[in-house]
Amino acid sequence: MNPTWWRDACQPLDTAAMDQARARQQQLTKPAGSLGQLEALAVHLAGLQGVERPNLDQVAITIFAGDHGVVEEGISAYPQAVTGQMLRNFVGGGAAISVLARQLQASLEVVDLGTIDPHLELPGVRHLRLGSGTANFARQPAMTEVQLRSALQAGRDSVLRAAQSGAQLFIGGEMGIGNTTAAAALASTLLGCPARELSGPGTGLDTAGVRHKAEVIERALVLHGLRADDPLQALGCVGGFEIAALAGAYLACAQQGIAVLVDGFICSVAALVAVRLNPQCRAWLLFAHQGAEPGHKALLDALQAEPLLALGLRLGEGSGAALAVPLLRLACVLHGQMATFAEAAVADRPV
């Protein structure tokens, strides 16, 4: 396999299918453009699927989990043991994403890339341990090169499994105490913004905690001397196993021809890494929502993304993306099942 597979070409959009979808939209029994963004979504999905009338019956959700060494710096309101506990909750069916996946009839895969518990073995979890969490990036690089490449590959492999199952839409979620700190550090590097403008409460830090979090990030960025034009170095130095896996998954989706629905702040950081590594993948990314973390809007702006929802979410897990799936499905159903003017014998122009 190509050792820099993430640079391989992405699938092109089917412009003929998009033209057919646009033509159909003009014939549906409604004023042109009256369904707003739903029309654009249907046309975009037509281009992604290569058909005039797309559908999203097959949705695959993968949760990537990993712990973060930077938690040693006191940047989280929760202990790292929660990561492993939540893995049990995911496969036990009690987490928000578990409930949403059931309601959507979506597949749910949970991948452990490295929690702090080296003995964690849970039925239903795919354990691909790369270490007992990342190293503390406030003192040294978060990942070795081998760990970074393995995490990217883990994301790719998850997509290949989803593709074999016929997935039409991929949602990546994440779990890892401390991962908003890693995401903010990455965002600060890639966007060239001060960490204090991008750092938020995560799982519930108070004002002093957020300030400390930003200070830890700023010191780490000075330590590593990161550059915005080297996203791979930044990912390895201050990222996380799950963030790297998400980036790898998004790139693989674009190469395999599977649409992606990107979740919140952490997933959007991974999306920006993916786009910086291979700009062609951007066309395959849809963005579910604008979350409550202060850095999320800056990321969406950098990605020129129009989020579908704004509900003040900051849970992660892929939950915001799952919430947006019914909207995408309804866009497809309206596009595919509304009558045309000719079928309904309705005048197609004003008097």
From Swiss-Prot:
Q: In which pathway does it act?
A: Nucleoside biosynthesis; alpha-ribazole biosynthesis; alpha-ribazole from 5,6-dimethylbenzimidazole: step 1/2
GO terms, molecular function = nicotinate-nucleotide-dimethylbenzimidazole phosphoribosyltransferase activity
Q: List the disulfide bonds.
A: none
Active site location: 317 (proton acceptor)
Q: Which NCBIfam families match?
A: cobT_DBIPRT (TIGR03160), PRK00105.1 (NF000996)
Which Pfam families is this protein grouped with?
Answer: DBI_PRT
Show the HAMAP family listed in the entry. CobT
Q: Which PANTHER family does the entry mention?
A: NICOTINATE-NUCLEOTIDE--DIMETHYLBENZIMIDAZOLE PHOSPHORIBOSYLTRANSFERASE (PTHR43463:SF1)
Task: Write the Enzyme Commission number(s) for this entry.
Answer: 2.4.2.21
Q: Which reaction does it catalyse?
A: 5,6-dimethylbenzimidazole + nicotinate beta-D-ribonucleotide = alpha-ribazole 5'-phosphate + nicotinate + H(+)
Query: Which InterPro entries does the UniProt entry name for this protein?
Result: Nict_dMeBzImd_PRibTrfase (IPR003200), Nict_dMeBzImd_PRibTrfase_bact (IPR017846), Nict_dMeBzImd_PRibTrfase_N (IPR023195), Nict_dMeBzImd_PRibTrfase_sf (IPR036087)
State the family named in the UniProt similarity comment for this chain: Belongs to the CobT family.
Q: What organism does this protein naturally occur in?
A: Pseudomonas putida (strain W619)
The question of whether Transferase is a record keyword is answered with yes
Please give the name of this protein.
Nicotinate-nucleotide--dimethylbenzimidazole phosphoribosyltransferase
Give the function comment from the record: Catalyzes the synthesis of alpha-ribazole-5'-phosphate from nicotinate mononucleotide (NAMN) and 5,6-dimethylbenzimidazole (DMB).
Q: Which terms does the UniProt entry file under GO BP? A: cobalamin biosynthetic process
This protein's UniProt keywords: Cobalamin biosynthesis, Glycosyltransferase, Transferase
